[in-house]
């Protein structure tokens, strides 16, 4: 699903994650998260 972020008002904060094992931060990795509620 494509989200047009320009239509969502408010403050936005970027977050970066890093890990010594790329498998942990790949899609479906244990350190990945998806926020679906604003």
Curated annotation (Swiss-Prot):
Keyword Hydrolase: no
GO cellular component, one term: extracellular region
Subcellular localization, as worded in the UniProt entry: Secreted, Extracellular space
Coiled coil regions, renumbered to chain: none
Keywords of this entry: Olfaction, Secreted, Sensory transduction, Transport
Tissue-wise expression: Nasal mucosa.
InterPro entries linked: Calycin, Lipocalin_CS
PROSITE patterns to which the protein is assigned, alphabetical: LIPOCALIN (PS00213)
Top-level taxonomic group: Eukaryota
Keyword Secreted among record annotations: yes
One Gene Ontology biological process: sensory perception of smell
Role: This soluble protein may play a specific role in odor discrimination and perception.
Family indicated by similarity: Belongs to the calycin superfamily. Lipocalin family.
Protein name, as recorded: Odorant-binding protein 2
Organism: Hystrix cristata (North African crested porcupine)
């Amino acid at each position: 699903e494509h989200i047009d972020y320009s239509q969502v008002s408010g403050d936005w904060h970027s977050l970066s994650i890093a890990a010594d094992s790329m498998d942990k931060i790949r899609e479906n990795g244990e350190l990945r998260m998806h926020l679906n509620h604003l």
